[in-house]
């Protein structure tokens, strides 16, 4: 089922009713931006206990981790590896339901210097830039479920490591080649509100369910304004035509790929609509394309995309999927020694 919710956009907007939340938060966007700043920029790790559910479920890559201690451990390790990390909140697209539960999709651009050791090796001293999109389900001042997608391929490459060799060292998926099919629960916890989609949501559904399915560059380009720009993984910016070629290359790596749109959330402004789409790719690594060298391994990848729509066409897009995690799945049984789901790679 695709869950679609539409809300007016609050950035520095009016005070919002937040049942069960700390009174210092003006609205749900303020909540997301404030706790991100206080935890990461001000390094107030203790705030995690107040803003994350004790039994939080976190989806990242093909893995699921549980418990607030996982968040704390990963945050401490990330800050040790990148102590000067700066996180710029580019957008928060949100919605709410009648129970007082909120859903947010937070796009973050980060700069950081690798001053401490990482799971991959010794500190490199290199400066990096990467994007993350975190979808959160929130109630009573606590995030209780999170879908985290970070451009880890960009991080590994900028640090100077070989992504394939590093993927072979990941031990988390060893012996779990069936992980992509059936192990991972796909039910959304608590998100029951569903609204009739507007033309803007229909445009995004059409992009994924028709243009991607047809694997047609021409059909995909019809959804975009002529001067549109797409911010893709590996810190690459594409035109609509160039991005259509990239998507085709991605899909060619999985000839039987199935794309499922799990959730759409939109915020309407005066002259534009911002839409967040969380989607799932499942398929067998069996072609050429972006992930060359067919292995026959079943793979899954969570993707999150943000769109700006004006005049019925996409003018700007940000799409993140963890291509490094896909490499880890492809090379799952190569005798890895790095526990990435327990490392700094498992948090925002």
Each language-model region and where it sits:
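C-terminal and inter-domain tail/linker signature
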Residues: 1-348
């Amino acid at each position: 089922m695709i869950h679609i919710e539409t809300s007016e956009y609050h950035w520095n907007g009016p005070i919002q009713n937040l049942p069960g939340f700390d009174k210092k938060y003006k609205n749900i966007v303020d909540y997301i931006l404030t706790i991100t700043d206080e935890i990461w920029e001000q390094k107030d790790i203790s705030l995690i206990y107040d803003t994350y559910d004790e039994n939080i479920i976190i989806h990242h890559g093909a893995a699921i981790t549980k418990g607030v201690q996982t968040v704390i451990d990963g945050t401490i390790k990330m800050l040790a590896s990148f102590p000067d990390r700066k996180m710029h909140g580019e957008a928060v697209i949100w919605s709410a339901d009648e129970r007082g539960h909120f859903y947010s999709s937070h796009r973050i651009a980060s700069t950081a210097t690798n001053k401490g050791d990482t799971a991959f090796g010794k500190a490199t001293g290199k400066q990096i830039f990467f994007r993350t999109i975190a979808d959160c389900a929130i109630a009573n001042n606590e995030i209780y479920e999170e879908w985290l997608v970070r451009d880890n391929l960009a991080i590994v490459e900028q640090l100077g490591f070989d992504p394939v060799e590093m993927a072979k060292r990941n031990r988390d998926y060893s012996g779990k080649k069936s992980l992509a099919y059936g192990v991972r629960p796909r039910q959304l916890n608590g998100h029951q509100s569903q609204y009739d989609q507007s033309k803007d949501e229909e445009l995004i559904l059409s992009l994924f369910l028709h243009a991607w399915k047809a694997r047609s560059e021409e059909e995909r380009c019809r959804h975009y304004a002529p001067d549109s720009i797409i911010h893709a993984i590996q810190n690459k910016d594409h035109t609509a035509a160039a991005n259509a070629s990239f998507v085709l290359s991605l899909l060619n790596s999985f000839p039987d790929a199935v794309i499922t749109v799990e959730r759409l959330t939109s915020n309407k402004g005066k002259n534009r609509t911002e839409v967040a789409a969380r989607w799932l790719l499942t398929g067998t690594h069996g072609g050429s394309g972006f992930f060359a060298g067919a292995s026959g391994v079943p793979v899954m990848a969570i993707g999150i995309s943000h769109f700006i729509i004006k005049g019925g066409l996409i003018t700007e897009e940000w799409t993140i999927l963890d291509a490094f995690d896909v490499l880890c799945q492809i090379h799952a049984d190569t005798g890895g020694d790095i526990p990435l789901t327990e490392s700094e790679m498992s948090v925002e």
